[in-house]
Amino acid sequence: MKGYFTVALFYFTNSVFQTFKSLIFEKKSLKNNYWSLLLLLLCFNIWGQENYTISGTITSAASNETLIGVNVIIPELNKGAVTNEYGFYSLTLPEGNYTLQVSFIGFENIAQPLQLSENKKLNFSLNESTETLDEVIIQENVEQLSIRKPQMSVNALTAETIKQIPVVLGEADVIKSILLLPGVTNAGEGASGFNVRGGAVDQNLILLDEAIIFNSSHLFGFFSVFNPDAIKDLKLYKGGIPARYGGRVSSVLDIYQKEGNSKEFHANGGIGAVASRLLVEGPIVKNKSAFLVGGRASYAHLFLPLFDIDNKAYFYDLNAKLNYNFDDKNSLYLSGYFGRDLFGVSDSFLNTYGNATINLRWNHVFSDKLFSNLSLIYSDYYYGLLLDFVGFQYDSGIRNFNVKYDFQHYLNSEIKLSYGVNNIYYRFNPATIIPNRPDSGINPSQLTHKFANEFSVYAEAEHDISEALALRYGLRLSHFTRLGQDAFNRYQNDQALNYNDQLELYQPATPVEVQTNTGTLATFTNLEPRASLSYLINDNSSFKASYNRMAQYLHLISNTNAPTPLDVYAPSGPYLKPQLLDQYALGYFKKIRNNEYSIETEIFYKDIQNRLDYRNGAQLIANDAIEGEVLSGKGRAYGLEFLAKKNKGKFTGWLAYTLSRSEQQTPGRTPIETGINNGTWYPSAYDKTHDISAYVNFELNKKWNFNANFVFQTGQPTNFPVSQSQFQGLTIANYATRNQQRLPSYNRLDLSATLTPKNKNKTIKGEWVFSIYNVYNRMNAASITFRTNEDTGANEALRTSIFGILPSVTYNFKF
């Protein structure tokens, strides 16, 4: 062993010498020596006194389900660890006698003596409980641990909190819940998706059990695709994003499903005004294997014929999961999701869209310090449109096949390494047009399929430098290949858009050549450094800072915020460059009165390169030359976020405020070209200057629980015509610069009450949820259109609103 140590020390010393030599004497850049410096920082902490490791898995005693985010703490050393996404933890400590504390919100805490003179495997099963005095004491240590972690701009919501927040039609909803967090908005009622810190919908990486979800909305954006009964853990990363995530430039919404109860059978569900849900779970092999199956469906369309309405709008989805624990070191998981939305008008129009995923994962514990997860993932998004009155079916979509292998290496109590590799293969179908009847008059058409591959590798260290200073630093290397296709357009001077200086507008260029059976069309390689730090001011407050660069190689081609937009994903290539983000954030975090209250304040700045913009009059539907409709610009967003929370007591909740700007700029490519808005900065479609949200939960007693939330937002940017002209008897509206007007401000108050009666039948437990959405019946504008009054000939504005006041009742049950 001594010989190995001598050799290692020699190579380490030589590496240090060569690194400083290249930096100081040869004046090479820091970028070229990034990995050497990272190694240098790590190695200072690897050698020391004799240490031993405790490791294991923490589960729920009731279901054997692993628990994410459990705190394992040694208060004497102010050291601790947190269980990962599969309930595994590892903590390396000097030899000695300690107190070991295990704490997780909603569960009984464990405090026991620990005599550490050898490596130990310690598994724990936690019992559900209400808060006790011991829990408060241990929780103080937990909060001191969390406030010094080098992680910022992240929000977590439990399934219980999501179910308490009153939303439209009484259905608990993930997306509607995160809209109450600072920095998160959407385009308004009836709009799909969500926007984070001024970013677009397609700039969010949405993961369900590691599989990509391309559209997060059901039923015009009124519901999300996530069944709240099936959710185990949810985190939203808005900045300081860990190196293991990539492919999007705005945020990461990472959701894990429950695994299923391997001890006994259970079922729970709910019956609401427009939808119902049911989830069943139980053991396959007791204490070793479990299953979970959950489904939801809406049925409001069944009542429309009673009102002589010949339309339909409904959704359904299915969640399923199997797991098998072979032994303490090997576990296998198979999970999937399938969802569809259907919207039809009479028999002439039918719109169908939805996601599907399947994921096979293998967990393996190599040692008490090394954990791994191998995932094989398939996901797709389908969009279909049946226009019977025209006589054709339109289909489009995107599929991907993903292989990823992730490792978590717990070197010692100061350093945790994460590293891994990921490869995603994409297949794009822009459009397939098929006539659906003999007299259609529509010719069959297939737009060119596109193919791409995205490879990435990353490494990251979480490093406790001292009692006060903690760092997380890492690097992600991504490589994107635009693969060959059957036909590809080539343009003169590689410009797919021409500028007409007489008309002062952009027009699609005519291809000078169409290549067939092409080889690789383009490759892009990007280094994506990530860094964040936390400095502990005292036991209850800290200062944090972060920087991250991210690359996005997929583009959502859509110039509408409509609830069922005709969205098409396109890969980067010779004419569509990848988006690149640089984000900086600073924050101050404070806990008050043993974490009864907490305050989080952050400022951020985002700079985005190669942000797509559309020429005036862009034609995006069934266009095989989409590159002739878009321009490359840039974007920026900056702002302040404030979050004040009350975490304990009969009254709990939070107040969130965001002051921000989100802007785009698309200058001309030459001095002659005007670009968009004459090349000046203008508000993006996601710019909301002021965003205020408040949530309050009041637990009156064991029977009654009351909730309220309030939202106020600056109106969404929009375009109003400034004049009109006549052409061949038609009135044509004329517009000036983009997004210089706004819709009226948006505000809404929602209330709910939950009644949990005493259940005489202990087998079945139930609760009633009474909710009122939009209590004061404000008709918030979803859009404003203009028309000519037939009687007076004057122009008039027409406001379109989605919802007024909506009361609802839901019955939830479990057994």
What is the role of each PLM region?
Residues 221-224, 232-242, 251-282, 290-314, ...:
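Short strand-turn segments of transmembrane beta-barrel domains in outer membranes
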Residues 551, 703, 711-729, 746-750, ...:
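C-terminal beta-signal and adjacent terminal beta-strands/loops
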Residues 604-607, 626-722:
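Gram-negative outer-membrane beta-barrel transporters
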Residues 53, 272-299, 308-342, 350-374, ...:
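Transmembrane beta-barrel wall of Gram-negative outer-membrane proteins
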Residues 108, 120, 137-242, 252, ...:
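Periplasmic N-terminal accessory/gating domains of Gram-negative outer-membrane beta-barrel systems
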